[in-house]
């Protein structure tokens, strides 16, 4: 078993008996904030129903964190808590929660700057000396917010200085401008560079999808994130997975549930559907080794590579209409998979593919025979072939 899979297995094992008890291990799905601690008893069961495994909660005090973790444990949800005492009284805070059945990891900092490295390294090392079982969580900036041309330098600084067991970054590519969907041009470069960094260090990475519609204002460049459709979510989640992400995070839980009334939003079922698809495809993606990723289309995203030849000896021909596709060749448990994603989250695309020899499709309903060389990919969706 490679180092990455060992780390993933160790993290998943933390959830046994509470937050992740299933017959088959699946890609963990995390809701990032957006859940008031005083409503945790009501909201955590809804999170479980929606298909979430873990929640990252930012709390005003250790007492509030523990209360929320108690509610999470009852619902079968794991928690990555952040609260002031973790930094101010590290030894006492770790002692108070390290044996809690809901604990997954310790939240240290979201989107730190480069000058935060020294104190974060010290905090990380102190916590790991007190509790070597549960890892620490730090989430890094997207490239557009952190000097795109120096982004690799910045993420390498963190990877070299702070020995976290996994890496995390956020970028939300689906925006709306004048009523139309616009994909951030920086997104796939971010996936390329972050996944390459994680691979260099032999560790898994976690990535995001946007579940909460809102306006992003100053000091960031203005943007509007629309109410997510299934196509929007599929494009984000499946792109993350095709590049090798091992945990999918949603910002925020408030995208699925009105946390004031504790009522489900219309988007609840959309997110629930997306989560069911993540779990169904987990045998392909959990612990996978991404061999290569290419793009097709008249224009391909910045800093990606065009598919110039067939991705595998079994593929005779491959073409995708419309905006183009993301094509990922993966290996997992001795099996080889080819995943093809419609890079358009609004419109369908037509896939025309031909193979040499026996090939099967891996679907949400199981492995099936390939019935036709031509198939329609719904917005943002994927098809997976077992080669």
Residue ranges of each PLM-predicted region?
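Glycan-processing catalytic domains of CAZymes
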Residues: 21-358, 363-387
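Sec-dependent N-terminal signal peptides
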Residues: 5-14
């Amino acid at each position: 078993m490679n180092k990455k899979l060992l780390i993933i297995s160790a993290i998943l094992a933390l959830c046994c008996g509470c937050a992740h008890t299933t017959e088959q291990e699946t890609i963990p799905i995390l809701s990032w904030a957006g859940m008031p601690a005083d409503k945790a008893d009501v909201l955590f069961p809804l999170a479980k129903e929606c298909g979430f495994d873990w929640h990252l909660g930012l709390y005003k005090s250790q007492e509030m964190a523990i209360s929320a973790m108690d509610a999470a444990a009852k619902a079968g949800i794991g928690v990555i808590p952040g609260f002031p005492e973790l930094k101010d009284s590290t030894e006492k805070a770790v002692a108070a929660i390290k044996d809690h059945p809901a604990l997954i990891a310790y939240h240290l900092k979201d989107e730190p700057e480069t000058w935060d490295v020294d104190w974060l390294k010290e905090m990380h090392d102190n916590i790991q000396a007190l509790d070597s079982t549960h890892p620490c969580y730090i989430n890094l900036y997207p490239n557009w917010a952190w000097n795109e041309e120096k982004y690799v330098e910045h993420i390498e600084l963190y990877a070299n200085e702070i020995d976290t067991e996994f890496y995390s970054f956020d970028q939300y590519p689906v925006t709306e401008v004048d009523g139309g969907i616009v994909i951030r041009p920086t997104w796939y470069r971010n996936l390329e560079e972050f996944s390459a960094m994680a691979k260099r260090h032999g560790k898994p990475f976690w990535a995001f999808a946007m579940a909460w519609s809102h306006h992003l204002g100053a000091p960031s460049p203005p943007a509007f994130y629309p109410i997510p459709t299934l196509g929007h979510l599929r494009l984000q989640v499946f792109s993350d997975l095709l590049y090798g992400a091992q945990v999918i995070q949603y910002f925020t839980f408030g995208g699925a549930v009105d946390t004031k009334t504790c009522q489900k939003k219309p988007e609840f079922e959309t997110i629930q559907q997306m989560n069911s698809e993540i779990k169904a495809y987990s045998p392909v993606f959990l612990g996978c080794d991404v061999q290569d990723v290419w793009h097709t289309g008249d224009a391909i995203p910045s800093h990606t590579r065009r598919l110039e030849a067939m991705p595998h000896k079994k593929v005779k021909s491959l073409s995708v209409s419309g905006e183009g596709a993301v094509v990922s060749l993966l290996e997992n448990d001795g099996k080889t998979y080819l995943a093809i994603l419609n890079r358009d989250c609004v419109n369908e695309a037509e896939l025309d593919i031909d193979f040499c020899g026996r090939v099967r499709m891996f679907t949400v309903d199981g492995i099936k025979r390939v019935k036709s060389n031509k198939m329609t990919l719904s917005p943002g969706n994927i098809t997976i072939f077992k080669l």
